[in-house]
Amino acid sequence: MDRAVSRVALENEEREAKNTWRFVFRIAILLLIVITLAISAAALVYSMEASTPGDLVGIPTVISRAEEKITSALSSNQDVVDRIYKQVALESPLALLNTESVIMNAITSLSYQINGAANNSGCGAPVHDPDYIGGIGKELIVDDASDVTSFYPSAFQEHLNFIPAPTTGSGCTRIPSFDISATHYCYTHNVILSGCRDHSHSHQYLALGVLRTSATGRVFFSTLRSINLDDNQNRKSCSVSATPLGCDMLCSKITETEEEDYSSVTPTSMVHGRLGFDGQYHEKDLDVITLFKDWVANYPGVGGGSFIDNRVWFPVYGGLKPNSPSDTVQEGRYVIYKRYNDTCPDEQDYQIRMAKSSYKPGRFGGKRVQQAILSIKVSTSLGEDPVLTIPPNTVTLMGAEGRVLTVGTSHFLYQRGSSYFSPALLYPMTVNNKTATLHSPYTFNAFTRPGSVPCQASARCPNSCVTGVYTDPYPLIFHRNHTLRGVFGTMLDDGQARLNPVSAVFDNISRSRITRVSSSRTKAAYTTSTCFKVVKTNKTYVLSIAEISNTLFGEFRIVPLLVEILKNDGV
């Protein structure tokens, strides 16, 4: 019994001893952990100089600055990426497309000639210097932001004069017509031996050439082929166009005054001619009895034509036969265009009555003077498949001289301000199936022409008159969406007299600083302007061909004025 009690007591003592040592061990371990943590914390504070909460206040600001630097760097990189994308995806393909277009035009021209070699059309198509590739017939200035009138013409530049001048006091050179394609240019004017008022006999000078760049970098026009048509055929009011087969020309043949022609009952004779690359000229009479069956007088617009969709398009105007189908369909039609910020004070009914009467001026016996466009297929056969388009007079004013232009993918018709509206007009033109459609025009309020009262330069109300002068605008500045912003032109800056020729860039309201040809009393007449670019130097030039008074040798001398387009970056 005692032995059993002793064993139990011994076991209890052993259990208590184990519990005591276990407790001591646990305390020791906890103390060791605490000491280790304390030493580690002290070491960390010492080695890292750990900040107190007060020291951490500026950290968000530092982080924000770092974020800004990173964002700025990323933005800068994005600008670089955008520029690379623009160059690779937009500009380079466009430049290649322009080059391809020029090459294809040249190949087309050569193809036409090769196919026509058997018909003696000639071979050896000329081509402008490579410096001009992509700089002819293009949208030369595309700018949405700059003020149009911050662009302006330089002083006139000396260059090679490619236009023959009169050689006697009674000689007269008048009515210049010019057109340029991607491969060559065409020029023509009328030559009268016995004064500018002689309507019975004249020559027609016609030339074909190319743009060159001299060794010193100067622009010049090089005539390669020319002919003086002196054959007792009195060609008048000629329009010229550069086509793949050479220089196509449309002329009327007349032996009477304009007033007498309007009094006749038959259409005016017309010819389609061509100066080939071989220097040979051929022409063919058009069947005007069929083509102009509703007309008593019909003339080319004197301004250049344009090669579009394998056809050449010429401006035409003249008098309609009273009560003919073409005349009847226009009866009651009219359009009124208004000056910028200068409205006509006349009653609306009176304005409408005067606008309707403006199409039938008394000078031409009350005949309706109509605008039109003639297109002819370009082939080795002249005068092939002619088609006449007569636009409605709800769009066009009284018929007048004009010009058909192509710039980029856009086509335009310029109409001389022979009626009451003085500011220059450019009608957008679309072509389809051999015919043309004209749309509401761009107007340039500061680009006026002189005229007789009540249709002087400042006129603002509809009236019946035949006045003005041919001074065409050339589309120069475009929006990126290809709509027109501004034009270049050489205008006669006088209210009533043909005086004071000045060149400028025009928007729809105002004009740039001007370049004056001479004094404000200098007499002048027709002007026609064409812009182009020397791609190598990225310089834009304008050839403005102007009739300037020349008292010693003939009444007028036709002068090819050349300017560079500059920009005032301060505007």
UniProtKB/Swiss-Prot annotation:
Which cysteines does the record link by disulfide bonds? C172-C196, C186-C247, C238-C251, C344-C461, C455-C465
Identify the InterPro entries for this entry: Hemagglutn-neuramid, Hemagglutn/HN, Sialidase_sf
What is the top EC class of this enzyme, as a single word? hydrolase
Instruction: Check the record and name the SUPFAM superfamilies matching this protein.
Output: Sialidases
Q: What Gene Ontology molecular function terms does this protein carry?
A: exo-alpha-sialidase activity; host cell surface receptor binding
* Transmembrane segment boundaries: 27-47
Instruction: Fetch the CDD domains from UniProt.
Output: HN
Q: What is its main location?
A: virion
Q: Outline the subunit composition.
A: Homotetramer; composed of disulfide-linked homodimers. Interacts with F protein trimer. Interacts with host CG-1B; this interaction inhibits viral adsorption and replication rather than internalization.
Its biological purpose is as follows: Mediates the viral entry into the host cell together with fusion/F protein. Attaches the virus to sialic acid-containing cell receptors and thereby initiates infection. Binding of HN protein to the receptor induces a conformational change that allows the F protein to trigger virion/cell membranes fusion. Neuraminidase activity ensures the efficient spread of the virus by dissociating the mature virions from the neuraminic acid containing glycoproteins.
Any idea what this protein is called?
Answer: Hemagglutinin-neuraminidase
The organism of origin for this protein = Newcastle disease virus (strain Her/33) (NDV)
Organism placement in taxonomy? Viruses, Riboviria, Orthornavirae, Negarnaviricota, Haploviricotina
Q: Which gene encodes it?
A: HN
